[in-house]
UniProtKB/Swiss-Prot annotation:
The modification N6-succinyllysine is found at residues 70, 278, 284. It comes from Mus musculus. Keywords: Acetylation, FAD, Fatty acid metabolism, Flavoprotein, Lipid metabolism, Mitochondrion, Oxidoreductase, Phosphoprotein, Transit peptide. The modification N6-acetyllysine is found at residues 70, 284, 426. Its cofactor is FAD. FAD binds at residues 174-183, 207-209, 319, 330, 387-391, 416-418. GO terms for molecular function: flavin adenine dinucleotide binding; identical protein binding; short-chain 2-methyl fatty acyl-CoA dehydrogenase activity; short-chain fatty acyl-CoA dehydrogenase activity. This is Short/branched chain specific acyl-CoA dehydrogenase, mitochondrial.
C-alpha cells in the first residue's frame, strides 16, 4: 500500500485559431490569484492570543494543500475532458485518491487513516475541485459523510471491519433520497421489517452518488412508519447482497464523471449487526452528516469557481481588441473585481464554518450560509468567465463551459439553496 505524502511528511490539442499563448486546452492555469494563496501560521513570541487570518494555515495544512494540488495537476487534469465526455470516472483516479491517503483524511491512524483535521478535508476538496468537481465530490462524500458516520456512530467491531477498507480500497455510498423524498427526505417510503435476526428492506432510492463504483451502501429505511421519521434507521448493505439492484447511471448535465444511479431493494435481508448506530436514530445521523457535508460542497463550489477564474483571467489579460487588452476596459475590470470579491467572501465563509466544526462550536447556520453562497457564486463566476472569453469559452475545447455545467448542481444537492435559506432564517429567528 502506498503511503500518503502527509504521512511521509510526518515521518520525515492544438489550437485551431490563434489565441493568446496563456490559453491552452484543458491545462492547469499558469497563474493564480495571489490573495487566494494561503500563508503558513507564524509562531508568536509572546503570550498573546493568536487571532490569525482565516487563510492562515498550519504547516500540516500547507503540506496537504500542496500535495493535493500536485496530484490533481499530474494525475487528474489529463483525464478530465475524457471522463466528462464519456461520463465515467477512471479507475486510476479512484486508486490514486486511496494511495495518496485522501479517502481517509480524518480517520484515525489505527484504522489506516491519515488522522488529519476536518479543515484538511475542506482544503483537499477545494484543490481537487479546481481541476475537476466530480473527483472532488468523490473525496468529499467519502470523507465528510461516509467515514464520519462510521467514526461517530459505528460499533467498535464495525469500525474495525469497515474503516480500514474505506480508507484504502472501498467506496461508500450515502443512500437517503427517494423519488418522493428529495428536500423532504424524511418522507421516505423504503421500509425495513424485522424478521428474526434480520431486517428485510423493500423500496427504492434515487439520485445516489457513486453507486456505480461503491461496494458499501449506507441505506436509510424506516423500521416503524407509524412513528414517522423517528423510525428511520441506517443499514449497511454490501453491493452483492441478494435482492439489491443498481440501476443505470443518469445522463447528467454536469459532474458527469460522478455516477448517479437508482437503487432497488426487493426483500433484501440485512443482519441486525449491520445496523449503524441505534434503531430509530437514522434521521439524527443523516442530519448531522449533511450539516458537515454542506461545508464540503461549499469547498467544492469554491474550488470550482476559483479554478474557472484562474483559467480565465490570463486570457483576458492577453486578448487584444481595439488596440488594447480587453482587461483594460473599465466595464470588464469592474466585473472581474466583483467576482474576485465574491470568491474571497466565499472562501472566508467556508473556512470559518470548517474552523467552527473543529472548535466544537455550533456551525449549522454558518454551514448553510457557506453552502448557499458558494453555490450561487460558482454559478455567477462560471457564467461570467464564459462571457469574458467569448466564443472560445463557449466551446468544449476549453474547460470553462464544463465548470459552468458542473456548478449548477451546487444549488440542488445536499440541500437546495432555498432549503439553506430556510435553515439560516430559522436560526436568525431563534437568535433574536
Amino acid at each position: 500500500m502506498a503511503v500518503s505524502a502527509l504521512q511521509l511528511w510526518r515521518m520525515g490539442g492544438l489550437l485551431r485559431r490563434r489565441f493568446p499563448t496563456c490559453l491552452s486546452p484543458w491545462k492547469i492555469p499558469p497563474r493564480v490569484l495571489k490573495s487566494s494563496q494561503p500563508e503558513a501560521l507564524v509562531s508568536l513570541t509572546n503570550n498573546a492570543v493568536a487571532f490569525a487570518p482565516l487563510q492562515t494555515l498550519t504547516d500540516e495544512e500547507i503540506m496537504m494543500k500542496q500535495t493535493v494540488k500536485k496530484f490533481a495537476q499530474e494525475h487528474v487534469a489529463p483525464l478530465v475532458s475524457s471522463m466528462d465526455e464519456n461520463s465515467k470516472m477512471e479507475k486510476s483516479v479512484i486508486q490514486g485518491l486511496f494511495q495518496q491517503g485522501l479517502m481517509g483524511i480524518e480517520v484515525e491512524a489505527q484504522y489506516g487513516g491519515t488522522e488529519a483535521s476536518f479543515f484538511c478535508s475542506v482544503l483537499v476538496i477545494e484543490e481537487l475541485a479546481k481541476v475537476d468537481a466530480s473527483v472532488a465530490l468523490l473525496c468529499d462524500i467519502q470523507n465528510t459523510i461516509i467515514n464520519n458516520l462510521f467514526r461517530k456512530h459505528a460499533s467498535e467491531e464495525q469500525k474495525a471491519t469497515y474503516l480500514p477498507k474505506l480508507v484504502t480500497e472501498k467506496l461508500g455510498s450515502f443512500c437517503l433520497s427517494e423519488a418522493g423524498a428529495g428536500s423532504d427526505s424524511f418522507a421516505m417510503k423504503t421500509r425495513a421489517d424485522k424478521s428474526g435476526n434480520y431486517y428485510v428492506l423493500n423500496g427504492s432510492k434515487m439520485w445516489i452518488s457513486h453507486a456505480e463504483h461503491a461496494e458499501l451502501f449506507l441505506v436509510f429505511a424506516n423500521v416503524d412508519p407509524s412513528s414517522g421519521y423517528r423510525g428511520i434507521t441506517c443499514f449497511l448493505v454490501d453491493r452483492d447482497t441478494e435482492g439489491f439492484q443498481i440501476g443505470k447511471r443518469e445522463n447528467k448535465m454536469g459532474i458527469r464523471a460522478s455516477s448517479t444511479c437508482q437503487l432497488t431493494f426487493e426483500n433484501v435481508k440485512v443482519p441486525e449487526t449491520n445496523i449503524l448506530g441505534k434503531i430509530g436514530h437514522g434521521y439524527k445521523y443523516a442530519i448531522g452528516s449533511l450539516n458537515e457535508g454542506r461545508i464540503g460542497i461549499a469547498a467544492q463550489m469554491l474550488g470550482l469557481a476559483q479554478g474557472c477564474f484562474d483559467y480565465t483571467i490570463p486570457y483576458i489579460k492577453e486578448r487584444m481588441q481595439f488596440g488594447k487588452r480587453i482587461f483594460d476596459f473599465q466595464g470588464l475590470q469592474h466585473q472581474v473585481a466583483q467576482v474576485a470579491t465574491q470568491l474571497e467572501a466565499t472562501r472566508l465563509l467556508t473556512y470559518n464554518a470548517a474552523r467552527l466544526v473543529e472548535a466544537g462550536r455550533p456551525f449549522i447556520k454558518e454551514a448553510s450560509m457557506a453552502k448557499y453562497y458558494a453555490s450561487e457564486v460558482a454559478g455567477l463566476t462560471t457564467s461570467k468567465c464564459i462571457e469574458w472569453m467569448g466564443g472560445v469559452g463557449y466551446t468544449k475545447d476549453y474547460p470553462v463551459e464544463k465548470f459552468f455545467r458542473d456548478a449548477k448542481i451546487g444549488t440542488i444537492y445536499e440541500g437546495a439553496s432555498n432549503i439553506q435559506l430556510n435553515t439560516i432564517a430559522k436560526h436568525i429567528d431563534a437568535e433574536y
